[in-house]
Amino acid sequence: MRSLATFMSLLTICWGLHEDRLTLANNRFAISLLHNLPTSTETNIFFSPYSISVALGMAFAGARGETREDLFQGFGYPRSDIDDDAVLEAYASHTRRLKSLRSNSTLDAAIGAAIHERISLLSSFEDVLNNSFGADILKVDFINGGQAAVDVINGWVHRKTRGKINLLFGGPLETIIRLVLLNAIYFKGTWDTVFDQRLTTKKPFMNACSTPTEVDTMRGEVYVRHKSFPLLGVDIAEIPYRGMDYSMTILLPTRIDGAEVLKRNITEHLLQDLVKQLVEQQVTVYLPKFKLETEYLLKDHLKKLGINRIFGSGADFSGITHGANLAVSDVVHKTVLEVHEAGTEAAGATGVIIVAESLVESVEFRVDHPFIFFIRNTQTKDILFVGQVNHL
């Protein structure tokens, strides 16, 4: 038996130098967050680093002083040679590129801001929301609106994820909330070579706890980019979606406990280097059908990455509005994923809650054990979705 790690990255949206650097910074953030999210033998990981970084990018636009520097360092912009004044233009270029992207796959990314109706935003922050992010502005009453305010936000998320995520928030929000910065992303891709449903059969999947489970497993003769790396103890296959601009890249460790070891040691540079070495060939692929649904409160995990000041009483978001001491109370993130014979469907939504401070030879590639995954655009290299499956 071999432990599997599947890295899926769903997108890369960069044409200019700053965008290339933003992609590098976002991919570093993706791997860092993967390292810091807790797992167990019976739980899985799935998140959209792209969704999280865009939502917090809006917070960066309104942050000032040490709070802005905290986000700047936490997202690794200096390590990627991005100047402070280049960050927002890089996001603006990403947004324009994303909306103009033509593909055989469906990729919808939406940005929004739910704002308390009595809050007067600075014109400079409104300009950033409109011009850099193309955000939808949702006016709500967080103080008296109760469930009505939640319904507005959940309705927006439901529409933008095509019904895959119904509830970002389950009930009425605190009355001290003044705005919620939102991102929603939806992906649907058809395999370049669709798996024949008639060949799907029950096969054992070795869970991380070493308990096998019979799961529906697809089988197909597929042309993929593939290579084995014996010295690293990993087998990699990149399964393309129709149009070849998106792919699911699967890293399959040779050891049954290899997923955790691989997760601890993978870097964005290593992933990129390994993918570059893959060679196209026909492979007999065995891939389980599976669904994932996850929800995270990211405050503690972001703090581990050095992003602290946005949450404290000393947070400085004076670039958003005058006359209110604002701080982030938490970052809510939800994702869903379904992998089946026809392809993949995934969605993610993020809400940054800001409150008024008081808080060739045919090869067999058998995916039959725990794995980590990214979905990515093969041209742009941005990581949009990351996950780790330990239990089916």
Swiss-Prot record:
Keyword Membrane recorded: no
Tissue: Female salivary gland.
Stored SMART domains: SERPIN
Main subcellular localisation: secreted
Annotated signal sequence range: 1-16
CDD domains listed in its UniProt record: serpinJ_IRS-2-like
Glycosylation sites: 104, 130, 265
GO cellular component: extracellular space
Pfam families named among the record's database cross-references: Serpin
SUPFAM superfamilies: Serpins
UniProt KW rRNA-binding keyword: no
A GO term for molecular function: serine-type endopeptidase inhibitor activity
Record localization: Secreted
Alphabetically ordered keywords of this record: Glycoprotein, Protease inhibitor, Secreted, Serine protease inhibitor, Signal
Similarity annotation: Belongs to the serpin family.
Cited function: Serpin with unknown function. Weakly inhibits human granzyme B (GZMB). Acts as a substrate for porcine elastase.
Protein name, UniProt field: Iripin-4
